[in-house]
Each structure stands twice: as C-alpha cells, then as structure tokens.
Amino acid sequence: GCCHIIACRMGCSPCCW
C-alpha cells in the first residue's frame, strides 16, 4: 500500500519502480 508520489520519492514502494 504506498504507491503515492510522496512514498515513491521516499523509496517506500517497489510498485513505483
């Protein structure tokens, strides 16, 4: 659950990469 742009930029979510 953290696919938001902020989470992406914080390196939180693999689904964003």
From Swiss-Prot:
Subcellular location: Secreted
A GO term from the CC aspect: extracellular region
Protein name per the record: Conotoxin SI.14
Domain remarks in the Swiss-Prot or TrEMBL record: The cysteine framework is III (CC-C-C-CC).
Organs and tissues of expression: Expressed by the venom duct.
Disulfide bonds: C2-C16, C3-C12, C8-C15
Methionine sulfoxide carried by residues: M10
GO molecular function list: toxin activity
Family the entry assigns: Belongs to the conotoxin M superfamily.
Keywords: Disulfide bond, Oxidation, Secreted, Toxin
Organism placement in taxonomy: Eukaryota, Metazoa, Spiralia, Lophotrochozoa, Mollusca
Superkingdom per UniProt: Eukaryota
